C-alpha cells in the first residue's frame, strides 16, 4: 500500500526588482497578517533604509517596532523573542543581511508567527530557505525553521551592498553543483531519500549561475537580479526536499570545519565555493568540471584558493580531512579521506 506523503512549505509571495522595498507593506497586506510588525535589523541596514521601511508600514496603518541585533547567536534569538512579546508583535520582518534574517526567522518560528524576509544583500540562500544558521562557540548550527511567508528583494539596495557579499551569494549557489552530486551519491550508496524535482531545480540553478557568471559584474543591478533569482530557486529546492541536501554537501562540511579551525576568516559563501572546487575533483577526477567551477568563481571575483580565503594550506587540509566528523551526512568524503588524497586534490585544482 502506498503511504508516502510530503508537506512542502514555500513563500506565498516573492517580490524582486528595482525599488520593491516600497511594496513591502503592500505584500504584507496581501498575506492578511494581524498585529504589529517587529522589524529585526542590524546596525548597517538600520542606517541605510529602515526609516523608509518603517514609514511605509505607518502609512499602511501599522505600528512597527524595531529591534537591532549586533551579533548572530542563540542569545540574540532569545532577545528578539522577548522584544516581540513585550511589543506584542504579530509578525516579524527580517531586514538586512544573513544575520537579522536568520535571527528573525528562528524567533518567528519559536513564536509561531509570520515572518517576512527583506534582504539588503545577496550573500547566501538563507533569505528564502527554511533553515537558520547561528554560530555557537567554534560551531555553526543549522536550525530548521519555517521559510518566510514573503520575500521582498530590492535589487537597487542589493546592488549597492558590498560586492564581496554578492560574490559570496554567487559562490554559495555555484556550490550546489557538487551538493547535488553528494545527495545522489548518498541515495545510491546509503539509500538516502532523493527528490528528483528538488535535485534538478538546484542543479539547474547552479548551472544557470555558472553559464551567466561572465554577466555578473560589480555595480550592475542586473547582476543582483540574476543572483537573487538563483538564491530564491535554491531556497525553494530545499523547501521541496524538506532538507538542506539540495544546497549542502561535502563543501558545506568543509566550510563548517573551517569555521571551527579559522573562525570569522572568510565569508561562508566564499568558503563553500573554494571547497566545491576540491569536492568536484573528488567526484569526477582530472577530467571533471572542477575547472568550470573554478573559472566561474574567478569570473565573479570570488576566491578560488585557500590563500585568497585568508586560510593557510595546513588548516584547509585539516578541515578537508576532518569535515566528515561535522554531522552524519554521507558525501564524497565518506568516512574521511587521507591527508595525501586531500593534498593531491587541493594541489591539482590549484586551491593550494
Swiss-Prot record:
> What UniProt keywords apply to this chain's record, in alphabetical order?
Cytoplasm, Lipid biosynthesis, Lipid metabolism, Metal-binding, NAD, NADP, Oxidoreductase, Phospholipid biosynthesis, Phospholipid metabolism, Zinc
Q: Which cofactor does it need?
A: Zn(2+)
Instruction: Quote the record's cofactor note.
Output: Binds 1 zinc ion per subunit.
UniProt key word Lipid metabolism:
yes
Location comes to: Cytoplasm
**Reaction catalysed by this chain?**
sn-glycerol 1-phosphate + NAD(+) = dihydroxyacetone phosphate + NADH + H(+); sn-glycerol 1-phosphate + NADP(+) = dihydroxyacetone phosphate + NADPH + H(+)
Q: What class of enzyme is it?
A: oxidoreductase
What Pfam families is this protein classified in?
A: Fe-ADH_2
Which pathway does it serve?
A: Membrane lipid metabolism; glycerophospholipid metabolism
Location, primary (coarse class):
cytoplasm
What Enzyme Commission number(s) apply to this enzyme?
1.1.1.261
Q: Which residues bind Zn(2+)?
A: 172, 252, 268
Q: Where does NAD(+) bind?
A: 98-102, 120-123, 129
Is RNA-binding found in the keyword set?
no
Q: Which CDD domains match?
A: Gro1PDH
Q: Tell me, what is an example of a GO biological process annotation in this record?
A: glycerophospholipid metabolic process
List residues binding substrate: 125, 172, 256
InterPro entries with a match to the protein in the record: G1P_dehydrogenase_arc (IPR023002), G1PDH (IPR032837), Glycerol_DH (IPR016205)
What family does the entry list? Answer: Belongs to the glycerol-1-phosphate dehydrogenase family.
User: What HAMAP family does the record tag this protein with?
Assistant: G1P_dehydrogenase_A
Name assigned to this protein: Glycerol-1-phosphate dehydrogenase [NAD(P)+]
**Which species is this record about?**
Natronomonas pharaonis (strain ATCC 35678 / DSM 2160 / CIP 103997 / JCM 8858 / NBRC 14720 / NCIMB 2260 / Gabara)
Amino acid at each position: 500500500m502506498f503511504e508516502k506523503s510530503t508537506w512542502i512549505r514555500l513563500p506565498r509571495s516573492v517580490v524582486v526588482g528595482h525599488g520593491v522595498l516600497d511594496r513591502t507593506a503592500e505584500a504584507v497586506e496581501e498575506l492578511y497578517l494581524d498585529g504589529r510588525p517587529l522589524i529585526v535589523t542590524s546596525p548597517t541596514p538600520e542606517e541605510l533604509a529602515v526609516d523608509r521601511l518603517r514609514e511605509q508600514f505607518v502609512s499602511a496603518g501599522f505600528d512597527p517596532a524595531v529591534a537591532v541585533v549586533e551579533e548572530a547567536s542563540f542569545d540574540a534569538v532569545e532577545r528578539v523573542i522577548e522584544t516581540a512579546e513585550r511589543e506584542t508583535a504579530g509578525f516579524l520582518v527580517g531586514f538586512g543581511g544573513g544575520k537579522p534574517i536568520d535571527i528573525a526567522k528562528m524567533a518567528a518560528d519559536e513564536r509561531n508567527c509570520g515572518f517576512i524576509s527583506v534582504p539588503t544583500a545577496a550573500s547566501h540562500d538563507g533569505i528564502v530557505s527554511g533553515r537558520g544558521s547561528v554560530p555557537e562557540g567554534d560551531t555553526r548550527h543549522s536550525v530548521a525553521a519555517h521559510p518566510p511567508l514573503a520575500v521582498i528583494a530590492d535589487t537597487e539596495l542589493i546592488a549597492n551592498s558590498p560586492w564581496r557579499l554578492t560574490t559570496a551569494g554567487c559562490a554559495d549557489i555555484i556550490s550546489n553543483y557538487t551538493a547535488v552530486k553528494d545527495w545522489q551519491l548518498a541515495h545510491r550508496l546509503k539509500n538516502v531519500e532523493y527528490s528528483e524535482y528538488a535535485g534538478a531545480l538546484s542543479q539547474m540553478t547552479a548551472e544557470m549561475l555558472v553559464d551567466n557568471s561572465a554577466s555578473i559584474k560589480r555595480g550592475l543591478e542586473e547582476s543582483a537580479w540574476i543572483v537573487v533569482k538563483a538564491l530564491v530557486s535554491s531556497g525553494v529546492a530545499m523547501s521541496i526536499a524538506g532538507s538542506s541536501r539540495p544546497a549542502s554537501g561535502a563543501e558545506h562540511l568543509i566550510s563548517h570545519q573551517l569555521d571551527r579551525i579559522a573562525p570569522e576568516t572568510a565569508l561562508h559563501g566564499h568558503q563553500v565555493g573554494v571547497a566545491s572546487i576540491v569536492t568536484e575533483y573528488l567526484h569526477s577526477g582530472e577530467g571533471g568540471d572542477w575547472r568550470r567551477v573554478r573559472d566561474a568563481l574567478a569570473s565573479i571575483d570570488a576566491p578560488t584558493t585557500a590563500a585568497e580565503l585568508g586560510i593557510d594550506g595546513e588548516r584547509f587540509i585539516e578541515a578537508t580531512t576532518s569535515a566528515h566528523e561535522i554531522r552524519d551526512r554521507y558525501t564524497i568524503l565518506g568516512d574521511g579521506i587521507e591527508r595525501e588524497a586531500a593534498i593531491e586534490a587541493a594541489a591539482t585544482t590549484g586551491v593550494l
